[in-house]
């Protein structure tokens, strides 16, 4: 996490077919799904962009894995929407949701909500650090008992790192 925060973790940008990547992530996540939860990949338009494949996969896989942990039954949807200057990825679940008073803290290090995870509470902090290093932002909307939607917005044009 400290390498991410100091921008010393190198990003490797290459042209990437985002639709194909999403299908690969879908196949990988489908193997982790438990009975009673449906996984749906939103039908997205074709998109090729320059991005770091490994980091984008890490971010989306982490968000999807969290959705699985917190959705006992229902559905998990994910996909992306393109705008003129950016692409917004989303992971939506019909799980337990996040209490309103906890929303502002979930991207902090070592934060876990009651009965929320078996991890150490670094996943969302790492996601946020990577997204910011890639020139984007991450946010969440949630309602207890209804689920959550995580949004990751990344620029279509590779960000320039100032030295």
Task: Enumerate the predicted regions with their spans.
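Short beta-strand/loop element within the Bergerat-fold HATPase_c
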Residues: 75-85
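Conserved catalytic submotifs in the C-terminal HATPase_c
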Residues: 12-17, 34-47
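Short conserved segment of the HATPase_c
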Residues: 98-110, 150
